[in-house]
A protein has these predicted regions:
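An extracytoplasmic/periplasmic, membrane-proximal ligand-sensing/linker region
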Residues: 36, 49-82, 229, 238-250, ...
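Acidic, polar ligand-binding/catalytic clefts
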Residues: 105-163, 174-177
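Ser/Thr-rich, Proline-interspersed low-complexity disordered segments
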Residues: 15, 22-55
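Bacterial N-terminal signal peptides that target proteins for export
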Residues: 1-10
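Pocket-lining segment of extracytoplasmic ligand-binding domains
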Residues: 168-170, 175-305
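Extracytoplasmic/secreted proteins, especially bacterial periplasmic and envelope-associated proteins
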Residues: 72-79, 83, 102, 106, ...
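Bilobed "Venus flytrap"/periplasmic-binding protein-like clamshell domains
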Residues: 57, 62-87, 144-215, 223-227, ...
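Short helix-initiation/N-cap motifs at beta->coil->alpha
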Residues: 94-109, 119, 194-208, 227
Length: 366
C-alpha cells in the first residue's frame, strides 16, 4: 500500500473511533433520594358563632304543660309573649309540648334557653333530673297553695273515699300533681285500689269524661269558689263544694264566662267545661279535697343566663299587674293564676317526699 493510501486508512479509523465515542452515553451518577413532602392538614373551618339567646335567631322557649285546652294556652301564651318582648327586647317562642314528661325533657335537653310553667310534681322531677330551678309560684285568689278534688256523680251513692274501691278512675295525666300524684297517695293512705284507670289528657277532659259517664269518678285541680261581688275566695276545707241549697240555681252567665250559683262563682275544673256542660254542677259533686299542695311553678332551665332571667322575672312581675294578665295565664280557661310570688326549692320537698314514698320517676310519666 502506498503511503498515501495508508494515511487515508488511518484517518478513517480515527474518525470512526471519534464517531463511536460520541454515540456512547456519558456515565451519570445515581440520582439522590428525595424525601416525600409532609402531608398538610387543611385548616379547620371556622365555627359559625351561635346567635345570642333571646335573639330572633335563637328565641327563648316558653313551655306550658297541656293541663287545659291547648288552644286557650296558645292564645294566652301569645299575650304573655308580646308583653315580655315589649318589656325586655328579647324574643320568645310559645310551646305546648304533648305531655308533662315532654315538657320536663325539653327543659333538660335545652338548659340554656327554656322557661317552663310546670306543676309541683313536674318541678320536683325536673330539679332532680337536671337541676331545673324554680323562680315563681302561682297565687290563686290569695292562696299560694291549691288542692286536688275527687269528683263523683251527684246522684251516686258514693259517700267516702273507701267507696271508690274498684271503680273506674279518670285523670288527666300521670305527670299532674293534683290530677294524679296526690290522689294516688290519698288512695294508698286509705287502703283502696281503683279499678280501670283512664288517662283523659287534662283536667277539663276528666270533668267531661265523668259528665259523659265514661268514668265513675275523676280527679282534677280544685280552687275555691269566689264571691261574685268582692271576688274573695270562699273556702271551707270540710265543705268545699257549692252549698246544696244553691246547686239548683247554678247557671251560665249571659256571656257564658262563668257558672254562678247564688252569689258564688265556681272556680274548680267543672267551670272549664261550662259551655259544653252548663249543668255540670248539678251533675257532679265534690267528694273531698286533698291537703294543701304547693302551687304550680315558673322555673328556668339549669343553665339559663342569670342576667336574662333577672330581666324576665322583673317583666313578669310587672305583667302580673296589668289587665292583660287576666287574658293570659290569669284566665279561668288558662291556668287561673291571679298573681305570682317568689318561690324556693325547699317548698317542694313535700312533693319530693311523695315521689320517694311511691317510687315515682320520670319513667312513670312518659
Amino acid at each position: 500500500m502506498s503511503k498515501r493510501y495508508a494515511f487515508v486508512a488511518v484517518s478513517l479509523l480515527v474518525l470512526a473511533a471519534i464517531a463511536l465515542g460520541a454515540c456512547t452515553p456519558a456515565a451519570t451518577s445515581a440520582p439522590e433520594a428525595t424525601q416525600a413532602p409532609e402531608p398538610t392538614t387543611p385548616p379547620e373551618p371556622t365555627a359559625e358563632p351561635m346567635p345570642d339567646i333571646g335573639s330572633p335567631e335563637h328565641p327563648i322557649k316558653v313551655l306550658f304543660v297541656p293541663s287545659v285546652d291547648v288552644a286557650q294556652i296558645v292564645t294566652g301564651g301569645e299575650i304573655m309573649k308580646a308583653a315580655l318582648e315589649e318589656a325586655t327586647g328579647l324574643t320568645f317562642e310559645v310551646s305546648v309540648p304533648t305531655s308533662y314528661a315532654a315538657t320536663i325533657e325539653e327543659m333538660c335537653a335545652s338548659p340554656t334557653d327554656t322557661m317552663g310553667f310546670i306543676p309541683g310534681l313536674g318541678y320536683a322531677l325536673a330539679s332532680e333530673l337536671c337541676g331545673v330551678d324554680v323562680s315563681f309560684k302561682a297565687n290563686r285568689f290569695g292562696y299560694s297553695v291549691y288542692w286536688a278534688q275527687i269528683l263523683v256523680p251527684r246522684d251516686s251513692e258514693i259517700a267516702s273515699i273507701e267507696d271508690l274501691e274498684g271503680l273506674k278512675w279518670g285523670y288527666g295525666d300521670v305527670g299532674s300533681t293534683s290530677g294524679y300524684m296526690v290522689p294516688l297517695v290519698m288512695f294508698q293512705e286509705a287502703g283502696i285500689t281503683p279499678g280501670e284507670q283512664i288517662q283523659t289528657g287534662g283536667h277539663n277532659q276528666s270533668a267531661q269524661a265523668l259528665y259523659n259517664g265514661e268514668v265513675d269518678f275523676a280527679t282534677t285541680f280544685y280552687s275555691p269558689a269566689t264571691d261574685v261581688d268582692s271576688g274573695a275566695a270562699v273556702y271551707d276545707a270540710s265543705a268545699p263544694d257549692i252549698p246544696e241549697d244553691l246547686v239548683s240555681s247554678c247557671a251560665l252567665t249571659s256571656d257564658a264566662g262563668a257558672i254562678v250559683c247564688g252569689n258564688l262563682r265556681v272556680r274548680d275544673a267543672r267551670a272549664n267545661i261550662r259551655e259544653a256542660a252548663p249543668d255540670v254542677v248539678q251533675k257532679e259533686r265534690i267528694l273531698m279535697i286533698s291537703p294543701d299542695i304547693p302551687n304550680d311553678t315558673l322555673s328556668f332551665g339549669p343553665e339559663f343566663p342569670a342576667d336574662l332571667r333577672a330581666q324576665i322575672e322583673e317583666a313578669l312581675v310587672a305583667f302580673a299587674e296589668t289587665d292583660a294578665w287576666a287574658e293570659s295565664i290569669g284566665s279561668q280557661d288558662f291556668y287561673n293564676w291571679t298573681g305570682i310570688e317568689p318561690a324556693t326549692d325547699a317548698e317542694y320537698d313535700f312533693i319530693r317526699q311523695m315521689v320517694a314514698a311511691t317510687g315515682f320517676s320520670i319513667e312513670d310519666i312518659r
